[in-house]
């Protein structure tokens, strides 16, 4: 193997375990011809939704075993729906108890996502399309779209025009329409008013809603979902895709035997959660307009849902053909060639043939493989070539792998003493130059904190070497994220059972009710109140919470559910900033430096948040060195959570560390 071949093969890194947010990314490796019957059914459902402005078609259930391509399929659906002038929303159903809160949060998140091929978000697109329908003056339309300063007069003129176009929708949905315009404004105060409205919260300041023509009384989440759907329906069809049902059901420990879902000895908590999920799925069609609901899950999950709700759910959903194996040698070859061609081009390498070193004749055996199994088998061969420093042509695939390995990570390259010194110097230089005030400002936290936290979590994973392979970090969130980062640990690949550590920064310059709104959004997105112990939420804040009754109640519920508030100091921000730049500059030997120096040990808030990680793993890797806990903004120590079952069943959370004195409240 020469140097050019070695470098080219090293670029062939497959990630066969996508996370839900990958649905929003471009699809550079998509190959036409995969799951054609299912895509055809979904697009037919979208056409049906588009043709009926006052109702929604039957929902669709897309079933496939893990690795069959459900997440990739949702990405294809998202792309094609948006190309047909429709809207797409992805609901990560992590908590059946807050079904409508979760659907609403997903719709708001989806509205803040950019439309492919433009810098315009789905929200901006919706407001632009609505503006084109109404007869309001151009100045009012531009203000509502966020292009110019929003005023009450402009908003009133827009609603008058909407009423002329569709009086019923304008009368029913006017408050939500006004909140959408406020959320598109460049003024953060306007956005705070909208955010609190969408959380069904009380007014932050008496009379602030009346100043924009809105009633003071909070509007329930289900009604806001209906409003959003009706407004969207005025301009085009929508798809609401529901994912992560398998992860939720896996917490019930009945995935291995769906018959238990109908058993008389199922616990009341299990039965209640399943009933709430089924009720929400059934009501979604009645609540929405021109909206196709797509439920993506493994077959066992659908069996469990159907058995819980008798025949009622099945009456409102139709099953698509199941996602199958590849069943086509040409399609299998195209899947690999598409990936290899892009990577080889990036490396400046011209292979002997597009699928090199996998012989075209090897794909004759690919019919029995799922797309993920094919990637796993070929990745195994590539790793063996690199390990032996010898290129061997792969001429046969053999049998599909029965066990799924973790997504591969490049082995650490031992850094020389000179390289270690160079990295040490670069790290020190970047720490010194870091911005330690901007990331926690109210106006910039949503933009600055996600990449910083992602860098810290990614470095933490890389420091663990092989023990980090079970972990993943969610891709960058939307521009208006409820969470700033999420670390996932997969406990069971088959059922997709996972543990999540979620993070959200809430700057000290947020006034009390704005901070409260962000706390509530983060709790919904993290599914903190599931009671499973598998969902953890850490709010990063250096100042004490407001002492208002509403905030005290919310913080108390947050803490009782296991949530913690952690301080972030200047040194934490310096380390995160340095790691972000170094990972962007990454070379092959950076992981060697990370594994040796382990800079995330200096992140006090992260060491505290992840103190219980090794209780969930069988191969925990090196134990973290003791560190002082991050300062907490609450004056009193956090209560220690109730004891959990033993690690074999469900690990007990680590005891809360002592907390430092709090900064005074704003």
Name each model feature, range by range:
Residues 312-313, 327-358, 362-369, 373, ...:
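Extended alpha-helical interface modules used as scaffolds for assembling large macromolecular complexes
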Residues 1-58:
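A short, basic N-terminal segment
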Residues 1-12, 187-357, 560-589, 593-596:
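The catalytic "switch" region of P-loop NTPases
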